[in-house]
Amino acid sequence: MGRARPGQRGPPSPGPAAQPPAPPRRRARSLALLGALLAAAAAAAVRVCARHAEAQAAARQELALKTLGTDGLFLFSSLDTDGDMYISPEEFKPIAEKLTGSCSVTQTGVQWCSHSSLQPQLPWLNUSSCLSLLRSTPAASCEEEELPPDPSEETLTIEARFQPLLPETMTKSKDGFLGVSRLALSGLRNWTAAASPSAVFATRHFQPFLPPPGQELGEPWWIIPSELSMFTGYLSNNRFYPPPPKGKEVIIHRLLSMFHPRPFVKTRFAPQGAVACLTAISDFYYTVMFRIHAEFQLSEPPDFPFWFSPAQFTGHIILSKDATHVRDFRLFVPNHRSLNVDMEWLYGASESSNMEVDIGYIPQMELEATGPSVPSVILDEDGSMIDSHLPSGEPLQFVFEEIKWQQELSWEEAARRLEVAMYPFKKVSYLPFTEAFDRAKAENKLVHSILLWGALDDQSCUGSGRTLRETVLESSPILTLLNESFISTWSLVKELEELQNNQENSSHQKLAGLHLEKYSFPVEMMICLPNGTVVHHINANYFLDITSVKPEEIESNLFSFSSTFEDPSTATYMQFLKEGLRRGLPLLQP
């Protein structure tokens, strides 16, 4: 077998084969590494773009501030709903609609004309404000267009009586309003007289006060229903101008506008609206008693909103069953308590801005008819117009028939029913402070007492008091136990301080002093013996804190939750009341 010559190829030898492809796992790692590198590069690019966009936005913001000033930027930002520092046609549409006379809600979700929106997107701007900011005279709402006057209808003249709030009754007056700027209170200080001392209304405007068909004497109905509750939240504080009134809201808005040009018929906090009941019925007439919760916003840009919330507006109207004649009308803020107005004002242009709160007293805020409604045009038997004045210049005097009432209800009972309609917790009778302890002695019961800064049963109440009355105090188990085992009362701190300083009655002094010793801001709930000794008490803020956590997180056995009730607040308040009974009942005189 010979050898091959040099350079001559032989058959292929079985030497090493060609390199095989890389294993799949190694390839996956390579791809993952490549993907990570690309992702990192993309993220870096995004960050660079974001920083660039932020820098551009900051530059635009700075330029806008320099060009428009603080107040102008505030207005611009409120319209710029997407925050891109440009006003698009859709964003400008509300202003355009107002300028062209349209009040329709836009299709972009801007709902500041809608009463169904509880959190408006533009919280301080609405249909009735856009043109007011651009012109010196506010535009009338499209909901308030007058019907053509009917010469045959009667008119009612109403006068406004107004005495401004007494600054010395405000809590912050005690330290000379230290830390409160004059600008913040300028709207309040400048409100010294009614906006319209007198106004004339057609009787048909009062049709919303007529009861629904078949309404019984003393049975409440809602003229304007409340749309808020603890579950819906509250309306924005950061608004200047009220939304256009609708339907039955219009007459309430017009009446309240006699006091101030910016009444809000729907309050920010529950209960809202207006409730009424019949207190007298005759063949041709009704007497209707009503209670209205409304408030006013006193500031205009560039100042921040200042809210003025009277305790309530109450009153009555006597009108014919077809609303063609009004015999009498009166509306007023009750002034029998030492404090009757809640005030809240913002220190910034956003919903999260700091807010100051105070309470005070307004001596008079009242509307009253000067007399019964009279015909707009007086005709004789032949249909000819008669001069409404005698030759001497004196106006003609009308003689009105006496109304014979067939059913009547007392003012006190009607007021109680309206109060319960607004505040279900008033299904328990809350007696005046000293009267409650007299009753407790007579019935040998403990006193359930609530001491607070603002009134528990009207709109001057403070935040934690509102929470209590809308949750635990109106719950069925609490109502039952309070009615069965306690005499209940609530009091203003200011009134007990006055009682404590009154030298004429030492027993009342002692009662007030025992309460004030246990009081902590803002609300204190107490269980007392008939002699005023406090056997148990809890602060509202602490109560709300412990009911906002899980039961197992509460260390105190005294305020532990019961498995009987699903609601932690109700369960805890029930434990508070029962502990008061456990401590107090053995100490009652047999």
UniProtKB/Swiss-Prot annotation:
Tissue distribution: Isoform 1 and isoform 2 are expressed in skeletal muscle, brain, lung and placenta. Isoform 2 is also expressed in heart, diaphragm and stomach.
Effect the entry attributes to changing residue 466 to Q: In CMYO3; decreased function in the regulation of ryanodine receptor activity
Compositionally biased residues, Pro residues: 9-23
InterPro entries on file: EF_hand_dom
Annotated PANTHER family: SELENOPROTEIN N
Illness: Congenital myopathy 3 with rigid spine: An autosomal recessive, slowly progressive muscular disorder apparent from birth or early childhood and characterized by hypotonia, proximal muscle weakness, poor axial muscle strength, scoliosis and neck weakness, and a variable degree of spinal rigidity. Most patients remain ambulatory. Early ventilatory insufficiency may lead to death by respiratory failure.
Name by which UniProt lists this protein: Selenoprotein N
Originating species: Homo sapiens
Gene name linked to the record: SELENON
